[in-house]
């Protein structure tokens, strides 16, 4: 269970082994139409804010990832840091890009910091990432985590190419349009985050 729940992604990006989310994911989530996908597939993203819509017990976490797309296939290098336990997790995700907007369902394997596989992808577990907005500096994404047929709940993340900071006005507007309040998100600048930029930039 821990390698699965270590994913967050986000893209791409899960919480931690104690994230405890439950409940169905929202069914009305759609990617932004007409979004230039190059705005999203543009280097390493850092999760600067996140909102778990149905938490039970959630450890604070930090996450970064680099998504790349080629021929309709998305691959991600994902790094996660549990700031309470001071533990790190590494994953590689892969999935197919949908035909409308930037949305993909991916499976992931667990690797070490040199990308050597520790545990292969479980075909029953996956995450669906939907890009709601993205510009040159920040993005808003929705993530639905699944363990087998069970949804683990909605997760919204605000991404930036900087490790800390506020999202752009465009992304702030997208947060509001989604019926969310940025003040309800966890701001990761308070978590003493560490990152492995060498892993995500490989």
Swiss-Prot record:
InterPro entries per record: Calycin, Nitrophorin, Nitrophorin_domain
Cystine connections: 25-144, 62-193
GO biological process, one term: vasodilation
Annotated residues for binding of heme: 80
GO molecular function: histamine binding; metal ion binding; nitric oxide binding; toxin activity
Main localization, broad class: secreted
Record keyword Magnesium present: no
Keywords, ordered alphabetically: Disulfide bond, Heme, Hemostasis impairing toxin, Iron, Metal-binding, Platelet aggregation inhibiting toxin, Secreted, Signal, Toxin, Vasoactive, Vasodilator
Entry GO CC: extracellular region
Cell compartments where the protein resides: Secreted
Subunit structure: Interacts weakly with host coagulation factor IX (F9) (inactive and activated) in the presence of Ca(2+).
Protein name stated in the entry: Nitrophorin-3
Species per Swiss-Prot/TrEMBL record: Rhodnius prolixus (Triatomid bug)
Upper classification of the organism: Eukaryota, Metazoa, Ecdysozoa, Arthropoda, Hexapoda
């Amino acid at each position: 269970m821990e390698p699965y729940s270590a994913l967050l992604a986000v893209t791409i990006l899960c919480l931690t082994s104690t994230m405890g989310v439950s409940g169905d994911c929202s069914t009305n989530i759609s990617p932004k139409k007409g979004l230039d996908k190059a705005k999203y597939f543009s280097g390493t993203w850092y999760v600067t804010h996140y909102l778990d819509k149905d938490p039970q017990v959630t450890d604070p976490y930090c996450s970064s990832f680099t998504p790349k797309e080629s021929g309709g296939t998305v691959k991600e290098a994902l790094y996660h840091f549990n700031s309470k336990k001071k533990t790190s997790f590494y994953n590689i995700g892969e999935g197919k890009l949908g035909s409308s907007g930037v949305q993909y369902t991916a499976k992931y394997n667990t690797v070490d910091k040199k990308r050597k596989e520790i545990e292969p992808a479980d075909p029953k577990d996956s995450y669906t990432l939907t890009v709601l907005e993205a510009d040159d500096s920040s993005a808003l994404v929705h993530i639905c985590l699944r363990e087998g047929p069970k949804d683990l709940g909605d997760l919204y993340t605000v991404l930036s190419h900087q490790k800390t900071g506020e999202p752009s006005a465009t992304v702030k507007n997208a947060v509001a349009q989604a019926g969310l309040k940025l003040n309800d998100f966890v701001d990761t600048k308070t978590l003493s985050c560490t990152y492995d930029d060498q892993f995500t930039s490989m």
